Each structure stands twice: as C-alpha cells, then as structure tokens.
C-alpha cells in the first residue's frame, strides 16, 4: 500500500518550510524570512509513531508572477488533489488574516481532513491568542513552534489519526506490478496501449493528459501483471506548469506499489535533467528499473546510433549502471516484445536471495584481492555478511567499526556481489554494522 500523503498549506511566510524540515528531520528546504523562498525539494518521507508517510511543502511552487490570491489558491488546490491529510499553517503572532480566510474557504470545500496549526506560539503567554483561530471552522487549533519544535507531537498525533486505514494489497504475490514513469509526452500511455493491443488509456499529444495512476491487469505467457500508468512529470517552468511538479507525488505512489519501474525517455527530445531526477526517485525507492527509450522510429539512425545513445545514457545515469536499456517505438511496436521478458527477469533479480556461504566466499575473495585501506592507523575488518532483505536485495556486512567503511569500498563490495550473482536491473544495498 502506498504511503499516506500529508500536505502543508498556508499563506506565505507562516513557517511552512521550517515545520516541514522539523517533521522530516533534516534541512531540505531553503528557509529565509522572505515570502516565497522555498524551492526545489518540496516533498520527503517522514515517520511518526511507526507510521511512514510522504509530506509536501506547498511553498515549493514558484508563483511569484501571479496575483497573491492565485498563489494561495494554487497551493491549496494541489494539496486538495494530492493529499490524504492537510496541515493548515497560520501565524500566531499575526492572528487571523484575510489570506488565512481565503485558504480556509478553499480547504473547507475539499472534504479532506484538515489539521489547523498555529505556528510561532513560542511561549505559554501566547496561547490565549489561539481562540480567534476557531473562527476558521476547523475545530481545535494546535499551537506549535516550528523554530523550537514545540507542540509538533500533538499536531502529528492528530494528523496520524486521519490516515486512511491500511488495506491488503489486492493482487497475489506472484503478480508482477510495474509502472511507467517519465516526463509528460514521452509516450508512457502509448507504450501501455501498444502492449495491451487496445486503447485502455486515453492518449493525446498534449502533455499531461493522463490523470493520476491507472491500474491495468494483463496476462502474458501465463504471467499476471498489473500495469500502473502515471501522469507525467513536467519540468519547472511557467505558472500553469508549476503545479505539474506535484505529479511526482502521483508517480511516487505508483513507484511504491511497483516491483519494476520503466523509466521512459523521449528519443526525439534527448535526455533532460528532469529525466535524471525522475529516475532518481525510482532508484531511491529501491525498485527494479528498466530504461526505455521511446519514439525510436522518429529519429535518424545509423549503425552507431544505439551505441552512442547507450554510452550517453550510461554517462548521464551513472547511478543506474545496473539498469538494462531498451530502444522501442510504441507507434511501430519495435522491440516491445522484449519488454515483458525483461520485466520478468529484473523482477526475479529484485527478489533474489543468495546462499550465505556463497555470499561470504565472494566477500572473502574480494577482501583478499583488495584489502580495505588504513584510516588513522586502523583497518576495516569484515567478520561476515548476510542478506537481510529483498526488493531490493540488502546485505549487512558486520565489521569492527562501521566508520571505517568508506563509500568507495562499499561500492567495491557491491560490484563484487554483482559480478557473482544475477542482480541486473535491481539496486542492491550494502550496509555496514558493528559486530556485537
């Protein structure tokens, strides 16, 4: 089941990004005391009382050229569309403002759970000022201080109480679930339609015409699949495009439900920065990945074109060195018959468990071939290694001191594991732990 989504909404300069950073536990938003400074990373994962969720900072949209009320309305509408629960942030020092009331009117029509939080209540004497906020119509307000971390626990308790009840996954374990992600108009829906042989998803040449995620069940050569098509992710740009940044939340939900993610690239447009960001989301989530270059029929080619493209992809997607690449055309169905066997292969690799004895032999041989470097007179000593998880395959290396496990040596061990076992198409994790 996909994680619940929580959106932080409020007029500019009420402290949304400070609260966002407090909740996720790291400083990922740029925070200054100027309205509209939040940019770039506007969502993250968080956890409260053992429950994980995704959280959005709606201040991440750049609407500086738009009228003030349009900025507020766009933020609120994004939250309404994407979130399961909305945290409505106000400023206790300034009281209820006209802008707060405008936000409240929009949120009130949403029928989504709203938790009203009054920020910048930094001392007990200010608590008498919270009663005016009952007029916004969302019940008990929660006084908090983002800068000092006060009151956030009570607020998050209220948020967690509104999370949807967890449902059992509706598909059997042996069903392979995969999603297609990419920028708008790279041809995700066209690929899906071509695979199915029927128009199950409405396709248009206008970017962003596929809404939300669409599950399609399919059986091929006796294997059951669930295909999850997502709305495309548009690069940051004009005001009407800026809300498309939030389609990443739709993609994240699809990614979380998937075993395999097909990262679709438009051959006509080449590789864009947004392609790399999108692929990074799937990699960070630990999903098996296939890179699909679509619209291969639409470009001029010679006998070297595939090699040139492959080298370029490997250079620009260095973090996806494990991902196979397929050059296809949804229009002509070129190489589409390769996709299902490849999906099966990377799905199997994603859930592969290896024998502990074979694994430790591989690690011992690797250490003998390339001993770890010295650090301040100490050398990393590896005692044994065990696989602790699949999807993705995750290995814990028990050592004398995890601080001595340099990133480069961790990568070296990962490469040796990949050489020994069939992990094509899947990320693997190597974690150093101190032996007790």
UniProtKB/Swiss-Prot annotation:
- Specify the superkingdom: Bacteria
Sites binding GTP 1 sit at: 10-17, 57-61, 119-122
Example of a GO biological process term: ribosome biogenesis
- InterPro entries in UniProt: G_ENGA, GTP-bd, GTPase_Der, KH_dom-like, KH_dom-like_a/b, P-loop_NTPase, Small_GTP-bd
Any single GO molecular-function term of the entry would be:
GTP binding
Q: Does the keyword Ribosomal protein apply?
A: no
Provide the binding site for GTP 2. 182-189, 229-233, 294-297
Q: Where is the EngA-type G domain?
A: 4-167, 176-351
Q: Which UniProt keywords apply?
A: GTP-binding, Nucleotide-binding, Repeat, Ribosome biogenesis
Key word Cell cycle present: no
Identify the residues that the record assigns to the KH-like domain, covering every copy: 352-436
Write out the similarity annotation.
Answer: Belongs to the TRAFAC class TrmE-Era-EngA-EngB-Septin-like GTPase superfamily. EngA (Der) GTPase family.
Q: List, alphabetically, the HAMAP family matched.
A: GTPase_Der (MF_00195)
Under the subunit heading, UniProt states: Associates with the 50S ribosomal subunit.
Write out the function statement from the record. Answer: GTPase that plays an essential role in the late steps of ribosome biogenesis.
Which PANTHER family does the record associate with it? GTPASE DER
What name has this protein been given in UniProt?
GTPase Der
The protein's organism comes out as: Listeria innocua serovar 6a (strain ATCC BAA-680 / CLIP 11262)
Name of the gene = der
